Amino acid sequence: MWRVYMKKILFAASEGVPFIKTGGLADVVGSLPKYIDKEYFDVRVFIPKYTCMKQEMKDKLRYVTHFYMDFNWQNVYVGVLEAEEAGVHYYFIDNESYFGGFKPYGDDPRYEIEKYAYFCKAVLSALPLLNFQPDLIHCHDWQTGLIPVYLKERFHGGDFYRNMKSVITIHNLKFQGKWDVKTVQSITGLPEYYFTSDKLEAYKDANLLKGGIVFADAVTTVSDTYAEEIKTPFYGEGLDGLLRARSHDLRGIVNGIDYGEFNPETDKNIVKAYNAVNFRKEKVKNKRALQEELGLRVDDKKMMIGLVSRLTDQKGLDLIAYVMDELCQDDIQFVVLGTGEERYENMVRHFDWKYGDKVAANIYYSDALSHKIYAACDAYLMPSLFEPCGLSQLIALRYGTVPIVRETGGLKDTVQPYNEYESTGTGFSFTNYNAHEMLNTIRYAEHIYYDRKREWNKIVDRAMATDYSWKVSAGKYQEMYDWLIG
């Protein structure tokens, strides 16, 4: 009997669920490997072992090996641990002087660069000792940007590494890992000629993400539209020229969400479970419960709009602030959950004080409350300035909560705007970053909700029928792996 050759993939990243999480990157690194076809791919993950990991997670780790490596002009300890989680093999790089502390990321950018340069070199150095020779290393964001560089530079001579390919995924182009050339050259030990404008140098600094983009065999980002946007100066964060040059190797693949965790039929956080068949009767019971819990006027018929977000400019809070007073004159309720810039936190608190029966400000973060908001609200507002992928709108669609979004990045790719003439669409959208354009779109949604309820429910039907599970995304990543490995 013939046997299929297992393609070996290694994920390298700075965080991953369930071990450590600060943002959406961890969800991707923790979820995607679970859904890659185990018959054809052997997928493993490398992340740092942070001292601030929860104790129950640390208890799962087993010692594998340790060694010493030349790094930053000294001989440095590298410990390697491992764990199995949801059928995926995880490895951890252990060095308390780099990964100690109360949080994964520190506030000193120079030290962060040293820390992740160490991580990149340690991952590559550890592989021969683990008896795992990946065909492809899948890197994520600037923290692993040096892996493609090191692969082509100091590790390229060894037989073990010679045919290894690399791909880098850009989750947010804003963060690039920049510091002065002299320091970064000293830390990384790379030759001087690597710090030219066609390699790691950008605008007189060394740039680790740029290094990854230049040296990786392919580049991906987290939605088709964002892949196009980052080739333009407005979204390109200074790297648009390079991304245009690499456009043949650049592709967008939308992130998924975990349909096990986000499922209105089985969600333990919500008062009343519901599904695509019975939402017309059952979903409103969650609204009633949330109105009582948050002290809003209890009214089944009142349109409730939700927002679960960091309260920052990137998320469009300046647009909301500009028209908030006008919006509060409408026959709606507005529920906000999240923290962020002080002026926006205070703005939301002010309107909660002024319109207590209409606005509920929850200036903290709670996973349980976020689920309740997704289940209770009729619409979900997401007017981002830029949004590489966005997960909130995918969760909203899953819960039959109609997204109102700005057409940018992943929002444009995942929310189909309502067309009343063709009776299509899964949400509402506006094009320009303009507060009154947003307000007009919200008011159009209000009109459909109040005056054409059957049409509204059909939008909900279509929203709940979309499939943005990880299974779909994993299929697209597998195609790319096949293309790269051959």
Per-region residue spans from a language model:
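Catalytic cores of nucleotide-sugar-dependent glycosyltransferases that transfer UDP/GDP/TDP-activated
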Residues: 2-486
